[in-house]
Amino acid sequence: MLGAEVIDLSMLKGHKMLNIDSDVEGHFLTSCAGGMTVDTVIPVTWQKQQGYGAGLTVTGLEGGHSGSEIDKEHANANILMGRVLKYLSDRMELAVVSLAGGLKDNAIPRECEAEIVIPEEKKAELSDSITELEKIFKKEYAVSDPAVCIEIKENGTGEYEVLSYSSMTKVIFYLRNVPLPEGARFISAGIHPWYLTREDYP
């Protein structure tokens, strides 16, 4: 991919390019795949907040290349973290310190980390909620991601810089809804597995 970005196109005479590629040595596929890299900016404000800090990690997912594994319906760690944060915010006062998920733009995110702050007296409820959510995820992804789990790390009581409530709700909404192409766009019912991404398909 990096080489294609700097190739000297002046030596080419054609106007169309066929992708001939495969992960297996000696095998070639003539195919077409599309991808998208999107930079999203969500304006946020910060504030100081006292409370109990904890780290949450959605992990144990299969992940995989967005091309060769896209038909497996693997879970997206970023979307699951959005669900985790929404679940918690509906049940307790929640603030978000940081979020980080995914390593490559052409791979299904297999891990997502969040640093949160909750009232000290909600520690037990946090643990119970995470246990309940993990059971839900394991049931939903029993086939595609059976090892899915949510880890908790204690960061202790103190003052943290967190997203304002309005900023946090925007970020959680974005994670849960992912207003971007996610997963396979179209799978043919007649020819399996055939994935169609042509813009001119009727």
Where are these regions (language model features)?
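Short glycine/proline-enriched loop/turn "hinge" motifs that connect secondary-structure elements
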Residues: L9-S10, W46-G51, D105-P109, E199-P202
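Acidic-enriched catalytic cores of C-N bond-cleaving enzymes acting on peptides and small amides
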Residues: Q47-G51, I70-A100, E120-E199
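A structural signal for small-residue-enriched, beta-sheet-centric alpha/beta enzyme cores
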Residues: G67, A100-E111
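Short beta-strand-to-loop capping motifs
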Residues: V58, I116-E120
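A structural detector for beta-sheet-dominated domains
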Residues: P43, T59, K153-N155
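Residues forming anionic-ligand binding surfaces in small-molecule and nucleic-acid pockets
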Residues: Q49-G67
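Hydrophobic residues positioned within well-ordered beta-strands of beta-sheet architectures
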Residues: V38, A54-L56, A114
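Acidic/histidine-rich catalytic neighborhood of metal-dependent amide-processing enzymes
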Residues: M1-Q49, E73, V97, Y195
